[in-house]
Amino acid sequence: MKTIIKIITVSIICTGCSEDFLVQPPLNAPTSGNYWHNEEEAIMAVNSLYQTFRMDNAYNCGHILLGDMIADDMTIGGAASSFLPLDDFSFNPGSAHINGSNDSYGLWGVWFNTVYRANWVLENIDKVEKISEEIKTRSINEAHFFRAVAYFNLVIYFGDVPLFTHLIGPDEATSAERTPANLVWQQVEKDLLKAAGLDNNLNPSGTPLPPKGKYELGRVTEGAAYAFLARVFLYQEKYDKAEIMAKKVIDLGRYDLNPDFGANWDNMMENGIESIFEIQY
């Protein structure tokens, strides 16, 4: 009898309890609501931008192969390769390397992922109270650099694309219209000029990204911003400005051609004197 009473009592207690205590916010991972407290968190947020460059259809391999295949600088063998639609120009918005697959972002997604992360940094960095002005400025410039590179790649592949310079939600993401390519190019230039500490006339106007060697290996530098600006101007046939930016890279005195051309493909010679910006693996 005592056993029956105990069972009934326990059953009443269990069925009468609220389950609210079982519903807990994530306790072992950061969220948008509990982030941006200190310098370390700001740096980690910026570091996530570097990670996007290592994704499959970014600079890891897909982005490089896409351009070379479409330009006929290389071809693909076999009949089952996911790159085949690019080789014979039968690709469409649903193709794996454009739209993505179950295990990776496509060309479209990987660069908009970069844009989102850059905007996340730029919209939240001012919330951080415990951060030095030097690291804050560096972080802002890094975010502008990565957003510029992302939109550069989007505009050269797709032309008119949605232009986001702020964080967006699902509704805006699904209803966004394409922005004319010329306005996207303007934003790319604007972001890179900010990262390089230059005004529209290419004169110093602010604090640029740090020089090569000041921080840990692999971070973007003023030289990278100058060099990418030169590339952006070249694509737009703004040759005078491209020449100015290329000369700025040379005048830094930190880069030179490698005496041994083959060393550029030697794993033991990575981040050499000819390297302006390398993705670290």
Language-model features: locations:
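Conserved, well-structured interaction surfaces
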Residues: 38-43, 47, 51-58, 80-158, ...
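Extended, well-ordered alpha-helical segments in internal regulatory regions
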Residues: 150-160, 229-238
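Short linear capping/connector segments at secondary-structure termini
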Residues: 27-31, 96, 165-172, 208-214
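Hydrophobic h-region of N-terminal signal peptides that target proteins for export
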Residues: 10-16
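Sec-dependent signal peptide recognition
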Residues: 2-10
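Short, surface-exposed recognition loops and adjoining beta-strand edges that mediate ligand/DNA contacts
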Residues: 33, 60-80, 164, 201-228, ...
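Membrane-proximal, proline-rich intrinsically disordered regions
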Residues: 17-70, 264-265
